[in-house]
Design a protein with these regions (language model features):
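Long, compositionally biased
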Residues: 86-89, 103-104, 140, 144, ...
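Hydrophobic/aromatic-lined pockets within catalytic cores
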Residues: 124, 145-146, 178
Length: 185
């Protein structure tokens, strides 16, 4: 039913893990509008090209002036440093299972399970991501399946089983049902 309602758009990969991780860190625990505003300022500081070298060269004060918290600045600076020193190796993720990749990504500062799942879904186009910490997904499930918010765990497991191995696609369509703008990271 949802697929028929949202024929335009699709899951699109940016194929740039540094960009996506920065966007994920910036967007944590703030509204989409606030995240977009901060991200635009961040992008401007990077002169339109977001990469580890440019971000590493920026001062913490410069990053804070974009509206980033001290912890987010530390997370982004640490990520840039690890990419440049090659102590974080994104290419390894391609060979990992979803759970192994989530654990590996979660070793990064400011990256938890939810952020790791967003990276797997949007950057690596993994097909079976079911991000149950995502409030939007839980709200969409409640709306579309006439369940109370938070849907019962037993129901979430049933849906997971139904949508496997395409939970990522189901997630995307469920998100679309509550937000006309296709989500991208």
């Amino acid at each position: 039913k949802l697929i028929e309602n949202y024929k335009d758009g699709s899951l699109v990969t940016r194929n740039d893990i540094f960009f996506s991780l920065c966007k994920s860190i910036i967007g944590q625990q703030i509204s989409v509008v606030a995240a977009n505003s901060v991200f635009l300022k961040f992008k401007k500081k990077c002169k339109g090209r977001i990469n580890a070298k440019k971000v590493h060269a920026l001062s913490s004060a410069s990053l804070k002036s974009c509206g980033l918290s001290r912890l987010k600045v530390k997370g982004i600076k640490d990520l840039a440093r690890k990419i440049l020193k090659k102590s974080f190796k994104p290419d390894l993720i391609k060979k990992m299972s979803d759970e192994e990749a989530i654990e590996y990504l979660s070793e990064l500062r400011q990256i938890g399970r939810w952020s790791a799942e967003m990276i797997l879904l949007f950057t690596f186009n993994r097909s079976n991501i079911w991000p149950l910490q995502d409030i939007g997904l839980l709200r969409a499930i409640s709306n579309n399946y006439k369940k109370k918010y938070f849907p019962p765990k037993s129901f979430l497991k049933k849906l997971n089983k139904k949508f496997t191995p395409y939970c990522s696609v189901a997630t995307w369509y469920l998100w679309r049902s509550i937000d006309d703008e296709p989500i991208q990271y």
